Regions:
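Surface-exposed alpha-helical segments enriched in charged/polar residues
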Residues: 33-37, 69, 73, 98, ...
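Cofactor- and metal-binding active-site motifs of prokaryotic enzymes
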Residues: 54, 74-75, 83, 120-123, ...
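Generic signature of intrinsically disordered, low-complexity segments enriched in small/polar residues
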Residues: 19-22, 31, 67-70, 146, ...
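N-terminal active-site segment of His-dependent metallophosphoesterases
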Residues: 1-69, 76-77
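His/Asp/Glu-rich metal-coordinating catalytic cores
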Residues: 88-190
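Metal-dependent catalytic neighborhoods of phosphoester/phosphodiester hydrolases
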Residues: 17, 50-68, 84-103, 108-109, ...
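A short helix->loop->beta-strand "cap" motif at the edges of active sites that frequently abuts
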Residues: 73-79, 182
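Active-site neighborhood of phospho(di)ester-bond hydrolases with catalytic His/Asp-centered motifs
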Residues: 7-8, 44-48, 79-86, 108-111, ...
């Protein structure tokens, strides 16, 4: 059975009322590496807000990329799935994707589109167990911004209705790929 560890809202680079939280973040990342190794986690999910601001410092970015390098080196079968949150710059988060994919890391920062319509299939990530078998499909949805979703006519709460419709259509797309033994894991930053 696949083992998944879900995290979110790391806010690397944050200061709290003038207090620099770098040491806290470093301790958290060390703890997370140890936990992943001890529990033989197959997939680490980061559901948005990796960074505290859309233009994170070089030190914050270095902290994140060192973590990715370390955790994937120490755990050769580990997959990472990262979605952008409202604090993250979607494009900045996706920029090093070709390098990160070499470390079994998928990042979904923006909703890919063709002719204005979401390419739902591009938001689906296969999750594999330690034997390399696909046990689940991850519906990896970054923070949805206006323009990422269609608002149904007559919707009272346009954001809620649009997001609901987006997820419904994504699930329908995933169901076409899903086998009877694969789970669906929906991940988003709302």
């Amino acid at each position: 059975m696949i083992s998944i560890l879900h995290t979110a809202d790391w806010h690397l680079g944050q200061s709290f009322f003038g207090y620099d939280r770098t040491d806290e973040h470093l301790h958290f990342l060390d703890w997370l590496c140890d936990t992943i190794r001890q529990h033989e986690v197959d997939v680490l999910i980061i559901a948005g807000d990796v960074f505290d601001v859309s233009n994170p410092s070089a030190a914050s970015q270095r902290m994140f990329y060192r973590f990715v390098s370390r955790v994937t080196t120490e755990n050769p079968a580990l997959q990472l799935v990262v979605v952008a949150g409202n604090h993250d710059s979607a494009a900045r988060l996706e920029a090093p994707l070709p390098l990160l994919q070499e470390m079994r890391t998928e990042i979904k920062g923006v909703v890919p589109k063709r002719e204005g319509k979401p390419l739902y299939d591009d938001l689906i990530v296969e999750l594999k167990n330690a034997r390399g078998e696909v046990e689940a499909l991850c519906l990896a949805v970054p923070f949805l911004r206006q323009g990422d979703y269609v608002v149904p006519e007559g919707a009272e709460n346009t954001y809620a209705a649009g997001v609901r419709m987006f997820y419904q259509e994504l699930v329908q797309c995933a169901a076409l790929r899903q086998t009877e033994i694969q789970a669906l894991v929906a991940v988003g930053h709302l």
